[in-house]
């Protein structure tokens, strides 16, 4: 068995309390600035999602539009015990919709959220000195830069090495273009936790420290989620920020990820005051995740309706390792 290097930091489990989440929504509900951010994101999400969904293959599309793998189809057929083509045909469309959305939803979220919190989305040609960048913000004498990934297992070894090379090679040019001496670079992940990451993100830091002369490293990667170095009088800090850590940093407040969740729910989930009386779940822990037993009978916020509370807990679970009724 291959042993992990001891220098990789061992993260604790990240636990969310439903009571804390509800309190955060109450706090946001009476904050005019936060409410406006949510409403602005809701409008933008709706517009972009509607446009994107319209471009996806629909029931009338021909089979070649779905780019199906015959091997996956047959393995799935065996797993489901299907007998007729009509049975698997019903599963092809939703499966394609999920896979198509997964590749685009992350980028859409970046484009919506970055300007709301004072950042600019970066668009650049492949293999240019800015191709690694997705977001930037000039903050006094600090240039804040970010490369963003949609999930915690998106990287492989080669990508990790390439990102490190891009940072070390281009940091001086980035700084001089904006007349700053300090760069705060983030490898950001839109959801997930440090624990469920495949740790290839941390290897960006290790690869940086292997490229930079030891005397120029002020904070090594060992047992840290960031490192720091200097090059040509430019001071560079590089951090790995996953899930809530990224959103807290982007918005410079601890409720940013809740704001994102509420905006998404408002944009995507039809609001009613009722609950789902017939709900039955297949996933073992889904009932406990989305249970609203902890919600007081008199709990009331204008941003969400009662049927949307389970969605709030459902989304929150994607940013933590455990969610508890406390």
Task: Give names to the regions the model predicted.
Residues 85-86, 92, 179-194, 248-253:
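A short, terminal or domain-edge coil/loop segment
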Residues 2-107:
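Interdomain/boundary linker segments immediately adjacent to catalytic/signaling cores
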Residues 150-227:
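Catalytic cores of nucleic-acid endonucleases
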Residues 200-326:
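Charged, structured surface patches that assemble and position nucleic-acid processing machinery
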Residues 23-24, 29-37, 44-52, 97, ...:
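Hydrophobic transmembrane alpha-helix bundles
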Residues 106-175:
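Catalytic centers of nucleases
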């Amino acid at each position: 068995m291959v042993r992990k290097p001891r220098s990789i930091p061992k993260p604790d489990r990240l636990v969310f309390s439903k009571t804390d989440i509800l309190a955060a929504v109450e706090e946001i509900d009476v904050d005019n600035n936060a409410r406006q951010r949510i409403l602005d994101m809701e409008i933008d999400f709706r517009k972009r999602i509607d446009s994107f969904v319209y471009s996806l293959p629909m029931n009338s599309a021909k089979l070649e539009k779905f780019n199906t793998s015959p091997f996956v189809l047959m393995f799935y057929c065996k797993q489901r015990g299907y007998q007729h083509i009509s049975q698997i045909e019903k599963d092809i469309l939703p499966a394609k919709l999920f896979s198509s959305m997964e590749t685009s939803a992350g980028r859409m979220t970046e484009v919506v959220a970055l300007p709301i919190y004072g950042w600019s989305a970066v668009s650049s040609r492949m293999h240019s000195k800015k191709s690694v960048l997705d977001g930037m913000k000039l903050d006094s004498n600090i240039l804040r830069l970010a490369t963003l990934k949609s999930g915690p297992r998106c990287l492989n070894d080669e990508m990790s090495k390439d990102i490190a090379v891009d940072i070390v090679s281009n940091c001086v040019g980035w700084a001089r273009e904006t007349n700053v001496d300090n760069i705060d670079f983030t490898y950001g992940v839109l959801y997930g936790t440090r624990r469920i990451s495949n740790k290839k993100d941390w290897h960006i830091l290790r690869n940086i420290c292997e490229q930079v002369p030891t005397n120029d490293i002020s904070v090594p990667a060992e047992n840290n989620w960031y490192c720091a170095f200097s090059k040509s009088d430019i001071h560079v800090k590089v951090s790995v920020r996953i899930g809530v850590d990224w959103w807290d940093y982007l918005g410079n407040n601890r409720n940013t990820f809740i704001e994102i969740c509420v905006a998404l729910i408002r944009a995507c989930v039809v609001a009613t005051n009722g609950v789902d009386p017939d709900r039955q779940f297949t996933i073992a822990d889904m009932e406990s995740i989305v249970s609203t037993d902890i919600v007081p009978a008199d709990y009331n916020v204008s941003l969400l309706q009662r049927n949307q509370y389970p969605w709030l807990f459902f989304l929150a679970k994607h940013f933590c390792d455990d969610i508890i009724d406390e």
